[in-house]
């Protein structure tokens, strides 16, 4: 190690000064990559692949930080997606609040791990504090509820399905899956979710050994919400056939349409059949911050568990998610004790070891990002961000639904709008690809067998004038390719 190449952070003023210089140089490289506002350089994937491969993998002798940063600035940064651009709107992939970028630096510098108290004292206590606040925020009872941060919505959803499976088998069959493996009735267990729900439900069923066929896909209505009558019919038929419905998933914001299922009616059916009700609110949970739109997810407190993604509407860096449970015992399915990590006597002496609540062992201090964002913005500031996103989606929908050149099949409840030019599938595909080459990135999906385009509007800096300009450009390209 030398002053020009500090190996680790330390108390040394020389090291701190050099590291500060490295940070300044890195920021300069980032800012130099900023363009005229476009979201993407438009580079061809084959050209970009060749440029990246030319950088090499592992040199015999290190190049030093300056050289590596120079290559990064030249080859990589110009072709990064600029998520803060108002021309980036394809996915639930948000720009990030500036204070949370600073929180990521703190997280990386200290490199805390959330599995045991002695690997992250302040980090552990902060996560516990934030979880306690979150369960209250979403209407769960403070004395019985719990949760933990996860790597993303998929892990949160899978964790919920595992917990529901173990809970149901204990209640229905007096069977301990954690100790004894799968019960004889396992092949007859069924989970119910919307036909347009997130694919992590299928992934969870595969991981649990039940397979995709154990996931019953409920048809949706014209607003892309679960058809409750079809759900009730499906449950009745499955029980009559000797199957065991153990869990249902209410989607609070479908990926494409932002649709919100009728969780109140689903709760009634789950109570009737003794089922766990999970809320996949990875997308729609952000509405909890909005006085104007909060009522749209008011039924979320009726669910037994909730997935919250902070790297979507909350505008936090990837990744940051949490699973919340109304009954803290649900998370005991992940609890194991290791002599070197989470000794039982530690808990008795006040040392909290969070490894017993999670599928993961090593976990990042993601709660700090939520803390810094919440404290910086407050309910009012966050409410303005959420209201802007939902309002922009409503504005865009009103514009295109009144335009005969477009179709817009579903009125948005959140901030995503699915639409298409009336010119046919190939035209819509070409329009999206051409926009990408120009630096404007929008989404593409399918509805009823038809290729659709998609705006996912999360950026609070997006103004109506920009929306209008993109509409004009889409129409121009549509006429060109027709």
Name each model feature, range by range:
Residues 134-166, 216-219:
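Short loop-beta-helix segment that forms the pyridoxal 5′-phosphate
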Residues 101, 122, 156, 163-332:
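Conserved PLP-enzyme active-site core in the AAT-like
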Residues 407-434:
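Conserved PLP-binding catalytic core of the aspartate aminotransferase-like
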Residues 254, 273, 298-401:
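Active-site C-terminal subdomain of aminotransferase-like
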Residues 2-144, 456, 462, 473-474:
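N-terminal entrance/gating region of PLP-dependent enzymes' catalytic architecture
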Residues 273, 447-482:
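PLP-dependent enzyme catalytic core of the Aspartate aminotransferase-like
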Residues 143-144, 186, 410-415, 446-452:
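Short Gly/Ser/Thr- and Asp/Glu-enriched loop/turn motifs at secondary-structure junctions
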């Amino acid at each position: 190690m030398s002053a020009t190449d500090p190996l680790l952070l330390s108390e040394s003023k020389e090291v701190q000064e050099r590291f500060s210089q490295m940070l300044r140089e890195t920021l300069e490289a980032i800012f130099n990559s900023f363009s005229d506002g476009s979201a993407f350089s438009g580079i061809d994937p084959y050209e970009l692949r060749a440029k990246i491969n030319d950088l090499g993998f592992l040199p015999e002798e290190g190049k030093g930080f300056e050289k590596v940063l120079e290559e990064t600035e030249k080859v990589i940064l110009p072709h990064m997606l600029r998520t803060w651009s108002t021309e980036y709107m394809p996915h639930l992939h948000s720009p990030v609040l500036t204070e949370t970028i600073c929180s990521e630096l703190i997280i990386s510098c200290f490199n805390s791990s959330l599995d045991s108290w002695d690997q992250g004292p302040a980090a552990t206590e902060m996560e516990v504090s934030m979880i306690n606040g979150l369960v209250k925020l979403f209407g769960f009872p403070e004395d019985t509820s719990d949760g933990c941060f996860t790597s993303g919505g998929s892990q949160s959803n899978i964790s919920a399905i595992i917990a529901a499976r173990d809970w149901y088998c204990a209640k229905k069959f007096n069977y301990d899956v954690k100790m004894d493996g799968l019960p004889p009735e396992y092949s007859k267990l069924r989970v119910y979710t919307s036909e347009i729900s997130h694919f992590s439900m299928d992934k969870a069923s595969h991981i649990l050994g039940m397979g995709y066929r154990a996931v019953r896909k409920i048809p949706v209505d014209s607003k892309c919400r679960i058809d409750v009558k079809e759900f009730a019919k499906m449950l009745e038929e499955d029980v009559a056939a000797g199957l065991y419905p153990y869990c249902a998933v209410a989607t609070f914001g479908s990926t494409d349409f932002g649709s919100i299922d009728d969780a109140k009616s689903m709760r009634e059916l789950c109570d009737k059949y003794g089922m766990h009700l999970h809320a996949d609110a990875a997308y729609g949970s952000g509405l909890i911050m909005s006085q104007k739109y909060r009522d749209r997810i008011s039924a979320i407190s009726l669910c037994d568990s909730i997935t919250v993604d902070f790297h979507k509407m909350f505008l936090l860096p990837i990744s940051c998610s949490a699973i919340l449970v109304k009954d803290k015992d649900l998370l005991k399915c992940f609890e194991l004790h290791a002599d070197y990590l989470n000794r039982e006597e530690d808990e008795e002496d006040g040392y909290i070891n969070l490894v017993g609540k999670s599928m993961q062992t090593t976990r990042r201090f993601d709660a700090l990002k939520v803390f810094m964002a919440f404290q910086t913005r407050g309910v009012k500031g966050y409410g303005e961000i959420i209201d802007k996103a939902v309002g922009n989606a409503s504005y865009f929908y009103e514009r295109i639904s009144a335009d005969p050149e477009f179709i817009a099949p579903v009125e948005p409840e959140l901030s995503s709008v699915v639409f298409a030019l009336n010119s046919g599938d190939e035209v819509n595909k070409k329009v999206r690809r051409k926009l990408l080459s120009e630096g404007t990135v929008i989404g593409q999906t399918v509805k009823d067998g038809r290729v659709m385009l998609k705006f996912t509007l999360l950026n609070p800096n997006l103004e109506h004038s920009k929306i209008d300009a993109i509409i004009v450009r889409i129409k121009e390209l549509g006429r060109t390719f027709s």
